[in-house]
């Protein structure tokens, strides 16, 4: 596939024939009506097929262990949240703040790539899923999901799986990518795009533990 070859040649940190570069990271125009431009690589990656770093939702640096005891915004467990809590029964000492979307200071894309990049919203993942075709494929020996826009341009999301504690045993079998949106009804969870290659399952899931380590694929808006 020609576009796949162009995507891989572009890399992630320099402009050599891709659709564009912002703050040193390449993006692809998939022809989406929102004008959203998707990064060619995961945050922490140098090539489209690299897994990159894993982040808990609302954290901006990778770590070795992902669970509630290491999560920044709780006091040790899922029902002791200290930020992004819409239900008092999930908050530490009944805490709520009604925050439902990542603040800029808690966005891994902004923290690592600078302003102009950010973690996609729920609606932007929906747009990608419904306005682009998607299929499982393998690039340079790495399995993942290829999204192709109506203009013929493509992005590849590697099957980096997710991390709970330090376990990533499903690497190469599934992918897990954060949105910037909280699960408002169950605030210990956040919204993410997930795919399971063997099941041909590609969908948006609301019930992802915020403390889990997911990939982040950044977006850039041109206007």
PLM feature spans:
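Sec-dependent N-terminal signal peptides
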Residues: 1-6
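C-terminal motif of bacterial Sec signal peptides marking the signal peptidase cleavage site
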Residues: 8-11
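Bacterial signal peptide processing site
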Residues: 13-15
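Conserved positions within compact, well-structured domain cores
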Residues: 17-223
């Amino acid at each position: 596939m020609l576009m796949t070859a162009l995507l891989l040649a572009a890399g992630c940190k320099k402009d050599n024939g891709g659709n564009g570069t912002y703050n040193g990271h390449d993006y692809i125009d998939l022809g989406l009506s929102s004008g959203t431009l998707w990064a060619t690589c995961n945050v922490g990656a140098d090539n489209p097929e690299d897994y990159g770093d894993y982040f808990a939702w609302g954290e901006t640096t990778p770590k070795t262990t992902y669970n509630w005891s290491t999560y920044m915004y709780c006091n040790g467990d899922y029902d002791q949240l200290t930020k992004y809590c819409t239900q008092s029964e999930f908050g530490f000492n009944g805490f709520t703040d009604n925050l439902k979307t990542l603040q800029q200071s808690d966005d891994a894309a902004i923290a690592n790539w600078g302003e102009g990049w950010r973690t996609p919203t729920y609606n932007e993942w929906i747009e990608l899923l419904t306005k682009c075709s998607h299929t499982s494929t393998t690039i340079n020996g790495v399995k993942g999901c290829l999204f192709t826009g109506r203009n013929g341009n493509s992005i590849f999301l590697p099957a980096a799986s997710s991390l709970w504690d330090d376990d990533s045993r499903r690497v190469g079998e599934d992918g897990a990518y954060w949105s910037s949106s909280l699960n408002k009804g169950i605030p210990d969870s956040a919204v993410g795009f997930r795919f399971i290659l063997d099941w041909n399952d590609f969908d948006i899931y609301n019930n992802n533990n915020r403390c889990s380590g997911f990939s982040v694929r950044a977006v850039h808006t041109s206007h």
